[in-house]
């Protein structure tokens, strides 16, 4: 009597279930990620608002003429680097808000979304860093005016403008650091598990 063998389907790769400890760690990491992104959103928004509203008008005495003064107004569009920083901060704030919304409405993060967030986290981190560094260099030149650069010491004439500019530079560097940490977490989400489930798994 011939034996009939029942064909057995090839085993599919099934991810092992997440333990209670892993679930707790994933939830904690997700909470940390959301907090970092919210803080980055706030810092980017503050940077943008502080720079856009940074404007001062002062009366400047003309050298050699004691009784002659001119009125001069300075604002963030004084240098292209500051305009670049405003744009970078605005993009960073908008992107972070988008990721926060996606994180709240979606319990799981698909691989496509994980790749999108990973790539843009890296990109925006470097864009913010470049913008903050360029703006800091221009601000330094305006504050100290090296003789070889033939710059005017703007900060000696427009103190409030420079103080407000300095505050925006501080928040821009803070947002860069926050984005760097978020980028590290998004890399972990993507590469620690092929199914991209660590922080956004249900349960």
From Swiss-Prot:
In which compartments does the protein localize? Cell membrane
Q: Which Pfam families match?
A: CASP_dom
Lipid bilayer topology: Multi-pass membrane protein
Q: What is the designated name of this protein? A: CASP-like protein 2U5
The cellular component terms of Gene Ontology attached to this UniProt record, alphabetical and capped at eight, are: plasma membrane
Family assignment from sequence similarity: Belongs to the Casparian strip membrane proteins (CASP) family.
From which source organism is this entry? Answer: Selaginella moellendorffii
The protein's matches in InterPro entries, at most eight in alphabetical order, are given as:
CASP/CASPL, CASP_dom
Keyword annotations from UniProtKB, A to Z: Cell membrane, Glycoprotein, Membrane, Transmembrane, Transmembrane helix
Instruction: Topology check: give the Cytoplasmic ranges.
Output: 1-31, 106-111, 186-203
Its quaternary organisation is:
Homodimer and heterodimers.
Q: Do you know which PANTHER family this protein is assigned to?
A: CASP-LIKE PROTEIN 2C1-RELATED, CASP-LIKE PROTEIN 4A4
Q: Which residues are glycosylated?
A: 67
Transmembrane segment boundaries = 32-52, 85-105, 112-132, 165-185
What broad class describes the main subcellular location of this protein? membrane
Q: Extracellular side of the membrane: what ranges?
A: 53-84, 133-164
């Amino acid at each position: 009597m011939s034996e009939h063998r029942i064909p057995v389907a090839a085993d599919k790769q099934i991810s092992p279930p997440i333990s209670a400890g892993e679930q707790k760690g994933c939830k904690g990491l997700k909470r940390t990620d959301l907090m970092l992104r919210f803080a980055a959103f706030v810092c980017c928004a503050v940077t943008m608002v502080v720079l856009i509203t940074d404007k001062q008008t002062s009366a400047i005495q003309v050298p050699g003429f004691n009784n002659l003064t001119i009125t001069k107004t300075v604002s963030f569009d004084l240098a292209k680097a500051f305009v670049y920083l405003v744009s970078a901060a605005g993009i960073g704030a908008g992107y972070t808000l988008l990721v926060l919304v996606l994180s709240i409405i979606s319990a799981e993060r698909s691989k496509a979304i994980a790749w999108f967030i990973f790539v843009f986290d890296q990109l925006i981190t470097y864009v913010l860093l470049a913008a903050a560094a360029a703006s800091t260099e221009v601000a330094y030149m305006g504050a100290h005016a090296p003789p070889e650069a033939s710059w005017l010491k703007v900060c000696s004439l427009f103190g409030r403008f420079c103080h407000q500019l300095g505050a925006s530079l501080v928040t821009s560097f803070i947002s860069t650091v926050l984005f760097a940490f978020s980028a590290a977490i998004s890399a972990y989400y993507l590469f620690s598990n092929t199914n991209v489930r660590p922080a956004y798994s249900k349960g």
